[in-house]
Each structure stands twice: as C-alpha cells, then as structure tokens.
Amino acid sequence: MDSCEVTKTRIPFKERPDWADVKPVPQDDGPCPVVPIAYTEDFSETMDYFRAIYVADERSTRALQLTGEAIQLNPGNYTVWQFRRVVLEALGVDLREELKFVDRIAGENTKNYQIWHHRRWLAEKLGADAVTNELEFTKKIFSQDAKNYHAWSHRQWVLQALGGWEDELAYCQQLLEDDIYNNSAWNQRYFVVTRSPLLGGLVAMRELEVNYTVQAIRASPENESPWRYLRGLYKNDTQSLVQDSQVASVLWDVLTSQNSHVHALRFLLDLLCHDLEPSQELKSAVDVLTPQSCSPDLALTKKICSILEHADPMRVKYWNWRKSMVRVQLLQSQNAERLANLSVQE
C-alpha cells in the first residue's frame, strides 16, 4: 500500500502478518470521559498501532508506512509528523521521494501548519537543490489561492535561506499584471526590493519603483495597495516623500479625475502634516471637491477632512477626529523633524 493512500479496501493492521508482533496501545481517556470523540474504527486502530511503535521508538520501514497512513487520516497531527522525521533520518530515505508524498497530502490541505513545517524541514535538508522545486510548488498553490499566507511565508523563507532571487521581481511583476489588486504580490514585491542581495536595496531601487507605482496608481487610484507601497518606498525618509515631484503630480492627476479620491486625499493629508508646501494646483483641486458648507477660509487640511467625511462615510468619526487633531499632528511632525536635525548635527 502507498504510504499516503488509504482506500476502501484497507486491510486492518490486526490482519496484516507484518504487524502480528505489535500490541496496539489504545488511547487513554481516563475512567470516566465526559465527551469522548467518536473516532472511526480505522482511525482508532491506526493510532493505537502508532502509539505502540512510538512508545517503542521503532524506526523501521513499516513505521514510516504507518505514519503515512496516520497522516492521511489526520494531516494535522504534529506528533505523527515529528516521529516521521525521526524515522526518515534513521532510514536515510531519499527526501525527494518524501517531497512527492508531501505534494499529495498538501493538495487538499494547503493551510495546514504541520505540512508546511515538514516541507521546510525537507527543503532545509536538501539545500540549494530544493530551490526550483519549492518555488514552483508555491506558484502552484498561488494559482489556487493567491493569498495563501503559508505559501508566501514558505517562499520568502526559501529565498532567504536557500536563494533563488534571480527571477523573483519579474514573478511579482507578472502577478500584478494578472491582478493589480493582489496585495500579497505587492507585499512580495516590497520584500524582494528590500531584501534581495541582487538589487542593491530600497534606496537604489526607489526611483524605478516609484515610477512603477505611480503608473499603477494612475491606472487604479481606488486600489489601496499601490498607495501603501508608495509609502513603504520612503520608509524612515518622509522628507524625501514630501519633496518628490512625482508624488505631487500623481496626487493632482487623481484629484482632478473622475475616479475615487479617497486614497489620494488621505495621502495628501498625511503629507501636509509633514510640512508639504502644496502647489496652487493642488489647493485648487481640493477646493473643487470641498463641500459648499465649508468656509472658504478653512485650512487646507481641514478642507480635506471635510471632503473625506462625505467621501468615506464609514470613517466619518475618524475624519472628524483628524480634523480636530490636525494642528497637534503638525506640531508633532515639526518637533520630530527638529530632533532629527539636531541628531544629525551632533
């Protein structure tokens, strides 16, 4: 029997000659279990025999086969997976064959922690030889579930631990061409830009990435992901963000278009709180969107909050609070900037 295949014609362990010497160890639920779990007969017997070989620490071929059957019945049993690793090492099994076993189990259990942990263990043992296979495996998972956290976490681990960075930015590009709203792909793109040893780091990549992101914003200004990505490109360097002419340009483009203005207004508000000196064009764009009930003399930041109260009604209380805190936020930003300058001078 295949180690991961439990069929309707399954032969009970008690009827298998090669298991005749093993005395099964039943589960001990105590003398008076309150709500005992109604296990199937096959599951109970399999686990009874597993407990027997586990207690005996039997590291044999039949033990490996048994763990395969137990995992098929319950892929989430971490004790079975752990013992399987012990047996695999003891037997010196070809781990590439073990990956095939995991592939079959993972097909219907793509969010199972134990399976991903076991796969990482295998990849770590196989080293650089596993890179291509693991990257392709995660691609297969993404074709079914583009936001599978386990697969993304595994892919990032593979890149950092084993390599394979060469085509990763191009892969992110392809994912975003397929779906510009794929926030997981945006996250991976940022991971690659900031972590890849081949690209030179965030500062070196910033201009190219800003160009790409600005184009994405112009194409879909209602998409929050590129706006967040743009912020990330200036992490710990807010002044460069404030001074970037491309940013001001895309803000004006969006605010004067017929598209959703919410993300652009939020972005502009934050820039103003970090001492952005807005152009007359930006001021005029905001004035056009400002409700008639607002005073013409109202500060630009408060005008933006008033617009957002109408454009983003779900957060109306938040924008009302931001309006009341604009002055405080501006002072905090200015104080932080002064402290940063003093630190540089020292």
Curated annotation (Swiss-Prot):
One of its GO terms (cellular component) is CAAX-protein geranylgeranyltransferase complex. It comes from Solanum lycopersicum (Tomato). GO terms for biological process: peptide pheromone maturation; protein farnesylation; protein geranylgeranylation. One of its GO terms (molecular function) is protein farnesyltransferase activity. Essential subunit of both the farnesyltransferase and the geranylgeranyltransferase complex. Contributes to the transfer of a farnesyl or geranylgeranyl moiety from farnesyl or geranylgeranyl diphosphate to a cysteine at the fourth position from the C-terminus of several proteins having the C-terminal sequence Cys-aliphatic-aliphatic-X. Its cofactor is Mg(2+). It catalyses: L-cysteinyl-[protein] + (2E,6E)-farnesyl diphosphate = S-(2E,6E)-farnesyl-L-cysteinyl-[protein] + diphosphate; geranylgeranyl diphosphate + L-cysteinyl-[protein] = S-geranylgeranyl-L-cysteinyl-[protein] + diphosphate. The lineage of its organism: Eukaryota, Viridiplantae, Streptophyta, Embryophyta, Tracheophyta. PROSITE patterns: PFTA (PS51147). Belongs to the protein prenyltransferase subunit alpha family. This is Protein farnesyltransferase/geranylgeranyltransferase type-1 subunit alpha.
